[in-house]
Amino acid sequence: GGFDNPDPVCRTRDFRPKTFIPRQNPFYVALPYNDVSRGEHKAEASRVIPWFRREYAGKGQSVCKGRWVQIVYNKRSCFAQWEDCGPFTTEDWPYVFGDKPPVNTQNKGAGIDISPAVRDYLGITGGTAIVHWRFVEFYRIPRGPWSKYGDNNPFVNAGLGAGKKSLQSREDRLRRQQEAIQRELLKDPAKLRRELQG
């Protein structure tokens, strides 16, 4: 890792920092919501996050971090992972998952922060720009410079492949249910005999 220097002269032609090979995907964004607070999911998380139930992997484990977003600027499209929260708030679920404008009023009402790689790929110059963004499923994302780097990137780390987390969580749930049934049966030997006899 290292400092993701935003100065364009400090970036390579494939949109990464010149001084190091990034261990995290340099194509990332921040959105003004965090689904986890104090080690637990926020009360509204399961209700407002469309993929919550499918991606749930355990108490306090974010279902938002690493989610893919498509960003469009001047008819150019880029893909990035949601890796941070902001700008300026982490509570704005009506904007992130709904149709409300950002509650933030600073920086011309910014509703998304983009990484230097996203900025440069889209050709954004200056401090602010109006972009359009939306969530996208991993299987819909074409290969591009966003698919080259990062231990957190399923293009690079196949162990993070789409659906793997939800499959693992389903398998874990089934295993826990089976273990609970086994514990109950072991508490009552007569019931266990009945179950074994069919």
What are the functions of these language-model segments?
Residues 1-196:
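Secreted/periplasmic proteins
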